[in-house]
Amino acid sequence: MHSRDLIEQYKTYVQDWRRYFHKHPELSNEEFETTKTLAKELESMGVEVHVDTERGTGLIGIIHGAKPGKAIALRADIDALPVQEHNTFDFKSDVDGKMHACGHDGHMAILLGAAKMLTAMKDRIEGDVYLAFQPAEETGAGAPDFMQFDNWFEKIDAIFGGHVWIDLPAGLISVEEGPRMAASSKITIRVKGKQGHGAQPHQAIDAVVVASAIVMNLQTVVSRNVSALDSLVLTIGNIHSGSEWNVIPGEAQMGGTIRFFDPAQEDHYVESIRRVVEHTALAYGATAELIYEKKVPPTINDAAASELAERVVIDTLGKEKLSKMRKVMPGEDFAWYLQEKPGCFTFIGIQNPEVGATFDHHNNRFTMDDSVLSAASAVYAEYAIAWLKEHK
């Protein structure tokens, strides 16, 4: 039996689970009921289940093959976002202010479908398949925390995962090698000037003016400090300063992010930002501090893993379903796994205007064409089987 033969059989199963999870979202590190539901369903399949009882969220399922061998993990993230859903379909979020607006409901459903297929094909599995249902991806710290649970990560030899992607037409799959998603870091800038009366600016050092100048000058980091052949995004997302209409504020704080693909350039980027921040403030008689927090490294696919994934997609779904897609600037904490184990992170197309699947990830009207998810389940299952067979 091949996973392609089970796609139609489990199509409704995978769709139903995606819609169940969509209706019952839980935020990062609060996925308690989600974890219980996943554990119960996996146990009903005869899968060995290990729940992170210390945190109460996240679990590892293990499918033992008919023959001994190495171990590979298939990963799905399970957390939702603090978004008020504006969709009107009957499986919209039942929880006020919480929504699966990124697609993790689809990821869980895909992995449950893969588990169903794998348990039906144990005779083809030469080793162990770990099913990693990871909490708190949206925090950026979910993966490194989850890696410590039950020593599971030390027991595996490779890993595979993916993300449903709204920019890719439904049914297409992208598995290219190399950088696929960007590193994500947070920047905080604190400006200190001198508070004063709104009618006497000459006696103050206006933190709003300083902050505004910093924002404008930071644009030159990308345009004049980075090669045009490299990719860097620098965004300031918020500015907070002052509280009264007639008072010149003496302090301001800004928050933002940088995204990039080349880890070797990170120090250069940070020092360029720091130089602009500090020296712009000095030009106005103020001071400014840059606080830099690394969230996730870039997601970089192993060449051999991607080559295998291409063969699996073609063999399982047909060559017409394999798509080339440009790397993207959002970050993904799956990158932490790929820093230590060979693996592949795939993009799964879900865009379909006929079902309203056109809104971007994190939008309050985000949805997906979930009719294609069982095909992704088949790719997950076949990748695990193929990898174990080729790495005896």
Where in the sequence are the language-model features?
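Acidic/His- and Gly-rich active-site-bordering loop/insert found
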Residues: 1-100, 109-125
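Hydrophobic face of alpha-helices
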Residues: 14, 32-39, 111, 208, ...
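Divalent metal-coordination and catalytic microenvironments
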Residues: 21, 61, 74, 104, ...
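Active-site beta-loop-alpha junctions enriched in small/polar residues
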Residues: 26, 77-79, 136-138, 165, ...
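Histidine/acidic-residue-rich, glycine-tolerant segments that coordinate divalent metal ions
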Residues: 59, 81-83, 87-99, 105-106, ...
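Hydrophobic beta-strand positions in extracellular immunoglobulin-like domains
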Residues: 63, 191-193, 258
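Non-cysteine beta-strand/loop elements that form the S-adenosyl-L-methionine
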Residues: 73-75, 187, 345-350
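Metal-dependent amide/peptide-bond hydrolase catalytic core
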Residues: 212-392
